[in-house]
Regions:
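Intrinsically disordered, low-complexity acidic/Ser/Thr/Pro-rich linker and tail segments
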Residues: 1-97, 317
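Per-blade loop-tip surfaces of WD-repeat and WD-like beta-propellers in eukaryotic adaptors/scaffolds
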Residues: 68-74, 109-119, 152-175, 202-227, ...
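Surface loop/turn motifs at the tips and blade-to-blade linkers of beta-strand repeat domains
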Residues: 78-82, 121-125, 177-181, 221-226, ...
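Loop/turn segments within WD40 beta-propeller blades
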Residues: 89-95, 131-139, 180-182, 188-194, ...
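Loop/turn residues immediately N-terminal
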Residues: 96, 104-107, 148-150, 204-205, ...
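Conserved beta-strand element within WD40/beta-propeller blades
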Residues: 98-102, 142-146, 197-202, 242-246, ...
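Conserved blade-ending motifs and adjacent loop-strand segments that build the rim/top face
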Residues: 268-272, 312-335, 370-398, 431-434
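Blade-level signature of beta-propeller repeat domains, shared across WD40, Kelch, NHL, RCC1
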Residues: 396-434
């Protein structure tokens, strides 16, 4: 059978130095040049996408309290924010100063060396929600979140510079930090050295990184897929992770360093009511709105996907407060938590509830690797007569030997609960726990 033309194998001879055939070295060079050009175009495209997602807001929604009068109170860490006599407590990280925000939009700064507090008030300071002392500040600077943005107060008695008298309130100088749409600040956190203040606000879907000394600011979007504002910010103790809780549902765990910004979304079906880190940084304890369940969020190492490591966060149930809690023979129903407060040494935690008139003090047991337990210790009730309930709580350091749990009640009464235990075993002995 004869072969067809299609079946006859062809033999093609290449002449290396023929004029019409390019040099192999030149071919390789052209190929590499084209690949480099295409890669550079791809890199520029991805860089533009990264900038559009991380450094500029996708939308600039401006919700107002007039449109939803209950919104700020619903997401606030204070119980009954609108009517509470005291809305927020903030302790200075290294001194005995304590700042309180009241419902008259005043800041009360207490110093144990003085009986009467210093009062800071301004027409620009309205609807105050939160405050944060600046670390390592020579002038005891205090940032206050409000409707306008941020009111930054400086104690002029500690400054050696001349300031504008129009911005003076007694012994303090006021500087207002504003950003378009970034109104009704809900939460704030200073970074480790006090050079950057991070804030969230109802008026925007981004968070802002402020540098007060240089008057610079950067906008970041923790979750580019959502247009929601953020209600709560919590820096991890090592300042490597920023927890950002959405006003709608879910939260972002953002890892920060000088070269990159990585985020992971957790619990996307529910709004986070409150959250707090343990001082060791191993656990983030949180509860969702409308729930009685306390969860722990733990960094479970990193998984390498191709060349890009991604953080793995494990969420586990710690306990359910729907059940009756027993402390020292007393049994009470707790219900939904309003806010958490953590002892600076990580030995105790305190909880305010949405519908109860007491504060529940807990002992933290994280002796088991990768797990944390909460042991109920005491129901703390108001130490004065009357129908009162707690509105806000905070732990602070009173002296080298004593720490304080400060409880503010709806009538304005301030209660101090002294704590002396320096370790878990010592706390067990004090409270007769085995």
């Amino acid at each position: 059978m004869e072969r067809t033309n299609e079946e006859i194998p062809r033999c093609v001879a290449f002449e290396r130095y023929h004029d019409n055939i390019p040099n192999p070295t030149e071919q390789t060079f052209n190929l590499l040049r084209n690949l480099a050009h295409e890669y550079w175009k791809w890199f520029l495209q991805k860089l533009a996408q990264l900038k559009s997602l991380c450094f500029w807001p996708r939308c600039n929604i401006r919700p107002t309290l007039a449109g939803d009068p209950q919104l700020l109170e619903r997401i606030s860490q204070a119980r009954g924010w609108k009517t509470a006599a005291i809305r927020y407590i903030e302790f200075h990280p290294t001194t005995s100063l304590m700042a309180l925000l009241n419902n008259r939009d005043e800041v009360l700064i207490y110093d144990k060396r003085s009986e009467c507090p210093i009062r800071l008030q301004s027409v620009k300071q309205r609807d105050t929600t939160c405050a944060a002392f600046r670390p390592w500040s020579h002038s005891s600077e205090l940032a206050v979140g409000c409707a306008a943005g941020i009111c930054l107060w400086q104690d002029t008695r500690r400054l050696n510079v001349e300031l504008n008298i129009r911005n003076m309130t007694g012994t303090h100088h006021l500087q207002v930090q504003e950003d378009a749409g970034h109104q009704y600040v809900t939460s704030m956190q200073w970074n480790e050295d006090g050079t950057i203040l991070i804030t969230a606000a109802l008026g925007s879907s981004h968070i802002v990184l402020w540098e007060p000394d240089s008057q610079q600011k950067i906008r970041l979007i923790p979750n580019p897929e959502s247009s929601s504002s953020f209600s709560l910010l919590r820096y991890s103790p090592d300042f490597q992770v920023l927890f950002c809780a959405s006003c709608d549902a879910g939260a972002s765990l953002c890892q920060l360093n000088r070269s990159e910004w990585r985020s992971k979304q957790v619990l996307m079906q529910h709004r986070i009511q409150t959250a707090v880190w343990t001082p060791c940084g191993s656990f983030l304890l949180l509860v969702t709105d409308g729930s009685t369940r306390i969860y722990s969020c733990t960094n479970n190492g990193e998984a390498t996907v191709f060349l890009f490591p991604k953080p793995l966060w494990r969420v586990e149930l710690v306990m359910d407060l729907q059940e009756v809690t027993t402390c020292a023979g007393q049994q009470r129903y707790c219900g939904e938590p309003q806010t958490f407060a953590m002892d600076p040494l990580g030995i105790y935690m305190a909880i305010i509830f949405k519908a109860q008139s007491f504060v529940l003090l807990w002992l933290l047991d994280n002796s088991r690797p990768g797990a944390v337990r909460l042991l109920p210790l005491e129901f703390i009730c108001c130490n004065v007569d009357g129908d009162q309930y707690p509105t806000c709580i905070a732990f602070g350091v009173s002296s080298a030997q004593t720490r304080l749990l400060v409880i503010c009640w709806n009538t304005g009464h301030i209660q101090r609960y002294a704590i002396t235990a320096k370790c878990f075993k010592e706390a067990q002995l004090i409270h007769n726990l085995k």
